[in-house]
Amino acid sequence: RYTIPNREKDMTEADGAAPRPEGATQTAAKRARRRAAKPKAEAAPQPPPATATQPPKPPAAEPPRPLNELIMEQTAESLSALSANLTQAMTRANQVFSTAFIDQTKDAATWQPDPLGMQVALNDVWSHLATQPETLRDAHAKLWERYADIWQRHTAYMLTGQQPDEGPVRDKRFRDPEWRSNPAFSMLRESYLATSEFITDLVEKAEGVDDATKRKAAFFIKQAVDAASPSNFLMTNPAALRALFQTGGESLLKGVENLAKDLKRGEGMLAISQTDLDAYKVGVNVATTPGKVVFRNRVFELIQYAPTTETVHEVPLLIFPPWINKFYILDLQPKNSMIKWLTDQGHTVFLVSWVNPDEDMAEVTFEDYAREGIYAAVDAVEKAAGVSRMNTVGYCVGGTLLAATLAHMAKKGDERIQSATFFASQSDFKYAGDLLVFSDETGIKFLEDKMDQAGGVLDAQVMADTFNALRSNDLIWNYVVDNYYIGKQPPPFDLLYWNADQTRMPKELHLFYLRKFYRDNALTEGKLTMMGETLSLKDVTIPIFMQSSKEDHIAPAQSVYRSAQAFGGPVEYLMAGSGHIA
């Protein structure tokens, strides 16, 4: 946790490493010193602590059986059943893929071979690498040295049976013990990791390639490398093979049916199920904190939550969540609902629920969302609560809109918002991470075409696919293995249910957001004009709290920290653990 010094900060430092919190004041240490300076009363005597009865530990799960044992136990009867189920699975898979192909060809006229400019970026990288023979020589020498080491160690392993000590498993793709205990799988795993590191390192070592091109090439190389992992193929995944032999092929039959459901739900495109979508219902077992809609216009509904304390704080709290997905990210279930926690602390909580737009809202703009969203919500809270000041929270893109509107309010002398808290929200987009790959003019034109095809809105699945690609191992390939190869049903998970409850976005709003923020970084550079005013975050002098997360891949911590430096008043910055939403 850091306090950002209230001083002018040069926001145009030379390209290089992103800024980190340097020389910042640790406010926790200050509070500790203040507490230490106060006289303390003598502690009252305490009874000795009771001896807690430790609950019995649950029995450890049995390790999965080695594949060799399962294969050796197969009988003629079991192999016959396995063969029959495999034949049935292949027949059904052919039907599923044929149906999906027919569904996809309905939009064949709009297909583009390389809509995001992947090949152009890769060609640029390879052409520059071709002029670096020493780099290529050293990289290949290192690769063959690793191959030789892998071969030598695994030959010794097969001859002696002594498994090499490799430390803890850090890559979740290879958590099955067979990836280490079986020399063949172990060698395959290590060879893949060596090769993937060789390829990705080459991209990084290409000289003379601009940052945007290198970022795009690195992103798509990583997608290809992740897809090529041996864990993603039935015949080279020990967990999938184990399930195949243990169930006589029924696991694959179930997996094909799971695949069929997801392709049907995606109308020919793969819409991967990440949770049990039938396990939750809004207002029944998610988003259950009592409240009512107190205002509505074409852009949003305003929910006021019922108080749970006898008295409440005078100043209400107004929350602006992202318009990507639904409003209840902060109100999943009572045990993890921030909304419930806030009302239990005596806060009067208002929350904006953005509209899920249709084609009629294609021309609605970012400025409309500021005027009819932020300003209208502030007016409505002022009327409902009977007060002329309030605290605010902006989450993700909701925070970006809030920051821009605060700058406009400062220009107009509107002082009704007395503080702002930002969760995983960027105002500066120079270091905005892999989403910058989709935010050059090539990517924006591709999305614009997609929105035109959809009648002027960005289809929810397009945004979901983009976010999944940012973490493909966790959000794509993990489910390919579990759902389609092993035949598991994804378990209920409230957060992933919310993640799957997607919304559309108006065309003009989204294009403005991509061009002005991701591409041009106009807000922090003082070049964003809204409602007739050129905005500057230095005009925003109210207290600001900025929360980032260490593993956030959508609003990277370094980007949020840079955003914190853009405001003109006191700012406290906190980097938490975990990722964008968990």
Which positions does each model-derived feature cover?
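Alpha/beta-hydrolase active-site loop
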Residues: 361-385
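Short beta-strand element of the alpha/beta-hydrolase
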Residues: 313-323
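Short amphipathic alpha-helix adjacent to the substrate-entry channel of hydrolases
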Residues: 331-349
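Amphipathic, low-complexity, repeat-rich surface-exposed segments
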Residues: 1-301, 312-313, 350, 563
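Short beta-strand/loop motif that positions the catalytic acidic residue
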Residues: 546-548, 552
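Alpha/beta-hydrolase
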Residues: 119, 239-294, 450-536, 542
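Conserved alpha/beta-hydrolase "acid-adjacent" motif
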Residues: 553-559
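Alpha/beta-hydrolase-fold enzymes
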Residues: 209-242, 383, 387, 405-510
